[in-house]
């Protein structure tokens, strides 16, 4: 082979390699949106009678502020900076909703991100290359008990599952009662390439914990087994604990 041609090829390869390294060195810019904390759902178990249909009673409670979503954004921000210290992060605490209803899905069935014009404009303004989206995830009810999982039907988002008939026993005192409350968090963390609006990777979170009615001192109502602050703190703890590994997972190639 002609020596000049060899030198030319070596030079081209060297330039290409240097260019690739320069591209790799460019830090990603992330935008973060959370759409999991606008409401809570109370799910009251209804015994199934010869059917696999979800007969549970679902009651949605709209929350007055974005406190839960704000905490979720902070959890993602911390996890992102641990996974990629060079990352530039923009938290969209008041991102415009998708076109139509505020609760409209932002992902379609083919893993395509479908923002409205206002949201897309807000994302473009940040200069972000990627989006981390926290969205509600619907799946089978699997409430975590000590040695098993309980419940029926399907759950989505954040809320509380209430059962009034299941016999439960406290592990610490041995006291028993019928019924339990189970705070739960069912959500999905998605990494989205904003150049193509395609999902790069998903991670689904299904977190829950059952609390026996036996913990309620003056009531047989499972709802009273936890105070208002305990209910909220358990939901927030799910987000703090489950979000970092979910973010780390979607960041992996």
Please report, for each region that a protein language model flagged, where it lies by residue:
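C-terminal/domain-edge helix-coil "capping" segments
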Residues: 22-44, 142, 147-253
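Repetitive helical segments and hydrophobic/amphipathic motifs
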Residues: 11-13
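Bacterial N-terminal signal peptides that target proteins for export
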Residues: 1-7
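N-terminal signal peptide c-region/cleavage motif recognized by signal peptidases
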Residues: 15-19
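N-terminal segment of the mature soluble domain
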Residues: 46-171, 184-188, 192-202
